[in-house]
């Protein structure tokens, strides 16, 4: 009974507690005088302040629209690719190399002893690696997982090439649309170079910018002409202008060129050279011999004739000009791609980058140096050379800081504030530290044209980095 009574008493006590009014929570104010009005006012102000702050935060910021390029191009290319990923060039398969069966006969109709010897070596090499069943080795590159892995490992390198190529496409589109008769060579070159610098947006010229001086070679001058200070040459209506400029990103140089005409007078020459360049690109690939590419280029080039003012001209490959491989900070990496038939059995290799360029001429098809020099480059691998002329030492320091082994021209030195440097520059050339590259010309009165693309031999494919909608 006692336990039952205690339970009833506990329930009654609980009911009494529940009937009491709810306790007022203690003030959290710092005031100890119990001034509730002040607290209410302060709380009201705080609430109002919070509302105001919330209103400010809730204001929607205007979304920035997509970046728009200016004319001339001045907006850095990175603003158009905020992910940092740049578009691929044109992707092609490597040429399908089918080895000859063992015992393949040597061509008995080779034109010279050198060519016969080269053919014999080629036959021996093919016989060594060949089999009774033709096998397309390069086709396997696109399905070999190891090659795909190697390709992915180089993604960052590919992206730097592609950034330079994108800058090149934007700048050359503007140049092609705006080069007009009456412009000076200086204004054309600077229009291109200013845009390259703006789109690269690099304070350090060794991290990105101009890959080499802009070539603006006219008519019978095929290459290596850019204006020096005071140049007054003006583009005329019937001129044939070769525009050759480069863009580099961390030493990876995109080298691409086109030929500009104001009318159709020499269009047949341009068509021949463009077709020859496309042949070179098509034939290029891993394990392809450079001499074979040259032979194919020459065959395409010299299948064309041009009729101008009632006279027919045979288009010729300029036999002492070549394409070349490109190494980091080195426009000519050591391998040459001939544009005529050659006994050169050197092969293209995986991972190499090449500038496939062809030059056609209505003249001799052979160039010599002539005229005032403007192009220079520090020789690769040159060691310490004792220089006695202080000005030469100072000039070399400027070259090292701003160009390294990238080509430069006298206008670039002028732009850096160098003065009275010609004797010092001559001293560097004579000392073997710097190489000069004078203009290259065919016979006067003829016309020359050029087209060029940069290609990269990836493990799985061939990428035409500089390909665009224009060429």
Swiss-Prot record:
EC number, as in UniProt: 3.4.11.18
GO cellular component terms, semicolon-separated: cytoplasm
Record-linked PROSITE patterns: MAP_2
Biased composition (Basic residues): 52-65
Cofactor, free-text remark: Binds 2 divalent metal cations per subunit. Has a high-affinity and a low affinity metal-binding site. The true nature of the physiological cofactor is under debate. The enzyme is active with cobalt, zinc, manganese or divalent iron ions. Most likely, methionine aminopeptidases function as mononuclear Fe(2+)-metalloproteases under physiological conditions, and the catalytically relevant metal-binding site has been assigned to the histidine-containing high-affinity site.
Subcellular location(s) per record: Cytoplasm
Binding residues for a divalent metal cation 2: 255, 324, 357, 452
Annotated GO biological process: protein maturation; proteolysis
Region described as Disordered: spans on this chain: 16-80, 92-139
Keywords recorded for this protein, A-Z: Aminopeptidase, Cytoplasm, Hydrolase, Metal-binding, Protease
GO MF terms, alphabetically ordered: aminopeptidase activity; initiator methionyl aminopeptidase activity; metal ion binding; metalloaminopeptidase activity; metalloexopeptidase activity
Entry binding sites for a divalent metal cation 1: 244, 255, 452
Positions with biased composition (Basic and acidic residues): 119-139
Cofactor: Co(2+); Zn(2+); Mn(2+); Fe(2+)
Record function comment: Cotranslationally removes the N-terminal methionine from nascent proteins. The N-terminal methionine is often cleaved when the second residue in the primary sequence is small and uncharged (Met-Ala-, Cys, Gly, Pro, Ser, Thr, or Val).
Entry-linked HAMAP family: MetAP_2_euk
Protein name as it appears in the record: Methionine aminopeptidase 2
């Amino acid at each position: 009974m006692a336990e039952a009574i205690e339970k009833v008493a506990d329930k009654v006590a609980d009911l009494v507690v529940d009937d009491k009014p709810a306790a007022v929570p203690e003030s959290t104010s710092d005031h100890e005088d119990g001034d509730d009005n002040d607290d209410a006012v302060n709380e009201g102000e705080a609430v109002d302040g919070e509302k105001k702050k919330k209103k400010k935060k809730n204001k929607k910021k205007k979304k920035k629209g997509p970046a728009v390029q200016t004319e001339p191009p001045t907006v850095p290319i990175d603003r158009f690719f905020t992910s940092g990923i740049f578009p691929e060039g044109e992707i092609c398969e490597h040429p399908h190399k089918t080895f000859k069966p063992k015992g393949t006969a040597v061509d008995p109709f080779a034109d010279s002893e050198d060519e016969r010897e080269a053919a014999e070596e080629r036959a021996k090499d093919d016989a060594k690696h060949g089999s009774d069943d033709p096998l397309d080795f390069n086709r396997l590159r696109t399905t070999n997982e190891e090659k795909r892995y190697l390709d992915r490992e180089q993604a960052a390198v590919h992206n730097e090439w592609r950034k330079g190529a994108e800058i090149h496409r934007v700048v050359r589109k503007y140049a092609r649309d705006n080069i007009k008769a009456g412009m000076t060579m200086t204004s054309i070159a600077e229009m291109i170079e200013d845009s390259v610098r703006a789109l690269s947006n690099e304070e350090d010229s060794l991290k990105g910018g101009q890959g080499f001086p802009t070539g603006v070679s006219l008519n019978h001058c095929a290459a290596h002409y850019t204006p020096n200070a005071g140049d007054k040459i003006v583009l005329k209506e019937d001129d044939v202008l070769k525009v050759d400029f480069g863009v580099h990103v961390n030493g990876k140089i995109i080298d691409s060129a086109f030929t500009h005409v104001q009318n159709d007078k020499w269009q047949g020459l341009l068509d021949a050279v463009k077709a020859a360049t496309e042949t070179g690109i098509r034939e290029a690939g891993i394990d392809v011999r450079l001499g074979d590419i040259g032979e194919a280029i020459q065959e395409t080039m010299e299948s064309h004739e041009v009729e101008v003012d009632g006279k027919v001209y045979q288009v010729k490959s300029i036999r002492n000009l070549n394409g070349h491989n490109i190494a980091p900070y080195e426009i000519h990496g050591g391998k040459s791609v001939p544009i005529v038939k050659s006994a050169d059995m050197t092969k293209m290799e995986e991972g190499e980058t090449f500038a496939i360029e062809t030059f056609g001429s209505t003249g001799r098809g052979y160039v010599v140096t002539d005229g005032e020099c403007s192009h220079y480059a520090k020789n690769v691998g040159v060691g310490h050379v004792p220089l006695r002329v202080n000005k030469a030492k100072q000039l070399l320091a400027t070259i090292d800081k701003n160009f390294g082994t990238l080509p430069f021209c006298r206008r670039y030195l002028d732009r850096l504030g160098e003065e009275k440097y010609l004797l010092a520059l001559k001293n560097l050339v004579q000392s073997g530290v710097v190489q000069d590259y004078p203009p290259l010309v065919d016979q006067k009165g003829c016309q020359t044209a050029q087209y060029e693309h940069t290609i990269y031999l990836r493990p799985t494919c061939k990428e035409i980095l500089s390909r665009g909608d224009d060429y």
